[in-house]
Structure formats: structure tokens, C-alpha cells
Amino acid sequence: MKWEENVRKVVPYVAGEQPNRPNMIKLNTNECPYPPAPGVRKAAENMESAALRLYPNSNAQPLVDELAAYYGVKPEQVFVGVGSDDVLSMAFLTFFNSGKPILFPDVTYSFYDVWADLYRIPYHTCALDENWHMNPEDYKQPNGCVIF
């Protein structure tokens, strides 16, 4: 199978219910009911507006260097992504390549199966019980990883 064929088989993400009512805060899409903290507001006001027109350093080197110094590691040991989906994508490519299925609950972050399908990583979902609890016995099987 060609890579392109594999991508075409990925089922597009479909957002959950998106009610359109006034004053509704949608926590499932990371909306926040609170205004920015005073320090954030002040930093935004003091920011040079020209900086907003430009992309940041593509490899986040200043941030990587600061994190490496803070944690006492080499910069090569620090990974910085451009959002949680980027970090998860890299984690799937890096850690879940044993050929064994990864396991995760059937009610979870909706992109786990998308990444698994895209990168041809076998997976198995484990049902939650009627009280939304995981059954540890479901995870006692050969696997490449368990995601909670």
C-alpha cells in the first residue's frame, strides 16, 4: 500500500456536538470562560506588534536552550512541538513502533485512533464500564503501549 492510499483511508475528524447558543462555553473545544490573567494582558499590551506578523524561530532554539539549561540536559535531549497534536504525532512515530497493538479506552481523546491509522500502528480500544471506569484486566494482554 502506498502512503497516499493510507492517508486517503483516514476518517476525517468530526467534532462532537457544537451547540450554538449565546453565552455557552464549550469546554470540550478548550474555550475558557475567564479573561486573560492580568500578567498575560500586560505582556500582550507591551508586545511589539510587528512580532505578531512573523513566524517564531522554527526550531524554538531559544526555548530549547532555556529548557535544557533549567533541567540540566543537552539541548539535543529536548523536544518542543508546535502544539499537542504535533507532540502526540511525534510520540506515536517514536514510541509505538513495536508492531504490537497499543491499547486505550474507547472513550478518550479522539485523535489516538487517527494517529494510529495514519502511521499504521495496530490498536485496540477497551470499553469503560457503566460507571466510566477502566477494567485493569482489559489491559493485561501483550501490547506495545497503554495510553490512559
Regions picked out by a protein language model, each given a short descriptive name:
Residues 1-54, 140-142:
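N-terminal "arm"/small-domain region of PLP-dependent enzymes with the aminotransferase-like
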Residues 56, 80, 104:
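Conserved SAM-binding loop
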Residues 61-101:
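Phosphate-binding glycine-rich loop
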Residues 94-115:
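Conserved PLP-anchoring active-site segment centered on the Schiff-base-forming lysine
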Residues 106, 125-130:
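Short beta->alpha connector loops at strand-helix junctions that form conserved
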Residues 119-123:
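A short helix-loop-beta submotif of the ANL/AMP-binding
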Residues 129-148:
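Active-site phosphate-binding strand-loop segment of PLP-dependent enzymes
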